[in-house]
Amino acid sequence: MPALSDFPPLLRLVLLVGLIALLPLCWWGLRQRGASINTRLATLTALTLFLTFDLIVFGSFTRLSDAGLGCPDWPGCYGEASPLGAHGDIQAAQAALPSGPVTQAKAWIEMIHRYLAMVVGLLILVAASISWRAREALPHSRWWAVATLGWVIVQGLFGKYTVTLKLYPAIVTLHLMGAMVLLALLVLQHEFFRARPLVLRAGLAPTGVLLVLGVVLLQIALGGWVSTNYAVLACTGFPTCNSQWWPAMDFGQGFTLLRELGQSGQGAFLNFDALVAIHMAHRLFALAALAALVTLSWRLWRQDDAIARRYALALAGLLVWQAASGLSNVVLGWPMIAALAHSAGAAGLVAVLTSLWARARVAAPALRPQFTPSPVAGDLHATRTSPQR
């Protein structure tokens, strides 16, 4: 049997990722022996969801470690399947530019991130294949799995261009948002498998939950723009920014999307006022996100339903978590642990809100008036039924 080193680099990379993916797949296969197809797919989706959450946090660690260019090509590292094979190239790059982005440690961080991303992609491919074959038995459309597979391919392209375009801020931010969309797609599928409706009353509809999710996603995009432009420390102090309530800001340059990292749209260095504008936009819009989440949490708490109240507590807890980690980033000088906690909290908010919307959406059709003929006069009368929780 040929050794792994005997294969071409790209094939070695595929084989290596396949071997890594065997671990979760074997665990899933052994644990779900004899289970129904829906149970097996639900468990596989939950496993993929867990790894996707980890991938988002580790992606933040990769970016915060300045390891995004630890391997400056894609998908391998200097044409090799791992930094082991690229040891000589990495040493040469580090010797040529000791303070540059290429080191052995950064190369490993970047490649571990890629391995994990490829494993997630492979698990999604397996789930999509099974969903397509067992489409008649699924409680929801097989196109959800197909859409997730298509989206993870798009995410792979974002990952590629993040590296090949040298951390182009718009691409890096799109890569972050794409990860959040992928997380939401997996949460939706997991909830559809379980089909647990949650009836919302007191003027709260699924549309309202979706609106709050949109506000949170916009706030995450602004936070991603802060991180990718390294504008976290553009403001020191809180609640003021650099001892001013309204500092000088250049929103025009700060929110020019088509530009290189650290440069304006004209190719000059990005001025400090632009970085302040980027930071302040995230800080100010946080007030809108705060208001939306507090309102939703309060309305959920008033539902007089144990499940709704759990969602209220989860959202309130994540809101406190985000406020504490966000403030820690500013007042403590952007410590790694606070930055990672902030990224994890953002992903948690997306997951909880998506789950809430999915469960409310399942319940909503059952609350629509059902018209049945009157046994007396043949008139149509509306009857309203509530689904089982």
Segments the model singles out, each with a brief description of its role:
Residues A21-R31, A128-S129, V187-H190, L296-W298, ...:
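Alpha-helical transmembrane segments
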Residues L44-D66, V215-V226:
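N-terminal signal-anchor transmembrane alpha helix
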